[in-house]
């Protein structure tokens, strides 16, 4: 066993002595040591219940004849961090999580790992670590929260609250109505109830094969999630016995399948960023052109909030992720069904008995929302290395208009609230990319303000930053190269005409190459917003969004 490094042989007497101080007995040294990587944090509703999850996981691991050791990671609640400097720490927290998990697991030579994530950057951070460490691993997420209901019976979620702010600002609802939405938008523990980033990543974790069937859709408060925990411990023991590791599971084909599900469900645009980072950790050469190829062959079968009024509880009721995959498998060339997963079985075996139970929620191949996926990769002279739009969250497929330029999210939100944006405008928020932000903050507050003011179909928004999974409308993010790297978005001037063509996958500014070259020569890189601390180091090391915004290792040659 891998853990023999710290527990076997006469020279490991000091190690065993320390381990006995934690409560271990001599007989425990013949059992696998299992890292229980938890993320219990009281301020994050998606993680507040995970201390109890950790106890259940440890009980299940002991029952399977193994020895559990629990530790915790940090985490950031993107909703609470939204709209202030806290959002700059969100994406960078992914790297801290990955590094901290790597540190604990490799320092103590564990034989296997069970990860208990749930929310936005915590799930991908743990997944990155699992691929980096590459020991047998199973994920059991905390699960989604249920949607809420206002006193009038209206179904609401977190995006409803954000949009309610814009609606109140524009006089569409009263302060009492906003308070009603606030009080009911997040009714319980769990990840926010729509197809936002947390649920998108937990669903992708399931189809990648690192989590068990049901992981993406079973609610946090559903007793079936406890059954998942028991299964996870049993499956981990099988993975250890068969030496099946994350890099055996997360192959190029598995990532294709993850993006196929993403396209079928119209997941968060953040999945592109995180899954490219996973590919990097797995040592795979995977880029945005391959994502675009997946988008072209996968129909959009399922619209979940914010693209519709359906929520994760509805997906679960309709058959869950397995039912969506089973329907997708009917189309040749969409899924790779014979690859291994954390169950110890193939994807084909995992979904064999699944079926759609509500075709209003999960559409059939014969009745898709669209013939192509719910995410699109756009390119053009404004995004030479690519940009991402959640095409399934807008009915507008082509938009052309003049730029209204803001050099930060704060500046943009103030401008929107002051009425500086009107119907037909293209809002540009720049210098918010991985380096420029730094930290590539999400633009949920501006998109929600636009939607709440009733301009969601009449105003486009472009940024080198990110969007929350709760964002909707004509929102194009991840524009690469970013402004801080001298990308075209940095060269735009007030009133320039921008064209967004979703069907043709184009993002263009209507000016000549000669004019762009002239502006590039005149452009001067702004001073970094942050020069010290973690964000200062992050800005120096982070790569572009089109490569997953991972940290580059300095060249010591």
Swiss-Prot record:
InterPro entries assigned to the protein according to its UniProt record, in alphabetical order: Dihydro-acid_dehy_C (IPR042096), DihydroxyA_deHydtase (IPR004404), DiOHA_6PGluconate_deHydtase_CS (IPR020558), ILV_EDD_C (IPR056740), ILV_EDD_N (IPR000581), IlvD/EDD_N (IPR037237)
Chain residues that bind Mg(2+): 78, 120-121, 442
Pathway it works in: Amino-acid biosynthesis; L-isoleucine biosynthesis; L-isoleucine from 2-oxobutanoate: step 3/4; Amino-acid biosynthesis; L-valine biosynthesis; L-valine from pyruvate: step 3/4
GO annotation, cellular component aspect: cytosol
Residues the record marks as active site: 468 (proton acceptor)
Binding residues for [2Fe-2S] cluster: 119, 192
GO MF terms held by the record: 2 iron, 2 sulfur cluster binding; dihydroxy-acid dehydratase activity; magnesium ion binding
Protein name in UniProt: Dihydroxy-acid dehydratase
């Amino acid at each position: 066993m891998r853990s023999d490094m710290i527990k076997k042989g006469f020279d490991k007497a000091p190690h065993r002595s320390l381990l006995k101080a934690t409560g271990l007995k001599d007989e425990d040294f013949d059992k696998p040591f299992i890292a229980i990587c938890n993320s219990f944090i009281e301020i994050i509703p998606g993680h507040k219940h995970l201390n109890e999850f950790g106890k259940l996981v440890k009980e299940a691991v002991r029952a399977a004849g193994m020895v559990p050791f629990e530790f915790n990671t940090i985490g950031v609640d993107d909703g609470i961090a939204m709209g202030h400097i806290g959002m700059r720490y969100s994406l960078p927290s992914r790297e801290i999580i990955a590094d901290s998990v790597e540190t604990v697991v490799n320092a103590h030579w564990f034989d296997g790992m069970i990860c208990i994530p749930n929310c936005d950057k915590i799930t991908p951070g743990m997944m990155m670590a699992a691929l980096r460490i590459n020991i047998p691993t199973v994920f059991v997420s905390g699960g989604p929260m249920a949607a809420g209901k206002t006193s009038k019976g209206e179904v609401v979620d977190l995006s409803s609250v954000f949009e309610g702010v814009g609606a109140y600002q524009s006089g569409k609802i009263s302060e009492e109505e906003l308070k009603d939405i606030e009080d009911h938008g997040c009714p319980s523990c769990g990840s926010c109830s729509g197809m936002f980033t947390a649920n998108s990543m937990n669903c992708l974790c399931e189809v990648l094969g690192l989590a068990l069937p049901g992981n993406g859709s079973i609610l946090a408060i559903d007793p079936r999630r406890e059954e998942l925990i028991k299964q996870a411990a049993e499956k981990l023991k099988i993975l250890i016995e068969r030496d099946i590791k994350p890099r055996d599971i997360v192959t190029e084909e598995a990532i294709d399948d993850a993006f196929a599900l993403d396209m079928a469900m119209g997941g968060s645009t953040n999945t592109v960023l995180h899954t490219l980072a996973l590919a990097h950790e797995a040592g795979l050469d995977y880029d945005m052109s391959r994502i675009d190829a997946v988008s072209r062959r996968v129909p959009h079968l399922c619209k979940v909030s914010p693209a519709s009024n359906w929520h994760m509880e509805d997906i679960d009721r309709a058959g869950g992720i397995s039912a969506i995959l089973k329907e997708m498998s009917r189309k040749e060339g969409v899924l790779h069904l014979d690859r291994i997963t954390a169950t110890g079985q193939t994807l084909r075996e995992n979904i064999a008995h699944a079926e759609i139970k509500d075709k209003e929620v999960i559409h059939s191949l014969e009745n898709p929302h669209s013939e192509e996926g719910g995410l699109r990769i756009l390119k053009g002279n404004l995004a030479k290395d690519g940009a991402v739009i959640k095409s399934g969250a807008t009915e507008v497929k082509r938009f052309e208009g003049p730029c209204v330029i803001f050099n930060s999210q704060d500046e943009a939100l103030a401008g929107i609230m002051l009425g500086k944006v009107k119907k037909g405008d293209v809002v540009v928020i720049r210098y918010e990319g991985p380096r420029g932000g730094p930290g590539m903050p999400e633009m949920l507050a501006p998109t929600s303000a636009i939607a709440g003011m009733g301009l969601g179909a009449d105003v486009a928004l472009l940024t080198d930053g990110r969007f929350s999974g709760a964002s909707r409308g004509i929102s194009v993010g991840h524009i690469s190269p970013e402004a801080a790297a001298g990308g075209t978005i940095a060269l735009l001037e007030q009133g320039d005409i921008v064209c967004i063509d979703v069907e043709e996958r184009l993002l263009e500014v209507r000016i000549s190459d000669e004019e762009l070259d002239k502006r590039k020569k005149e452009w001067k890189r702004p001073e970094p917003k942050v020069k010290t601390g973690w964000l200062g180091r992050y800005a120096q090391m982070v790569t572009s969004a089109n490569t997953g915004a991972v940290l580059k290792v300095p060249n010591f040659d």
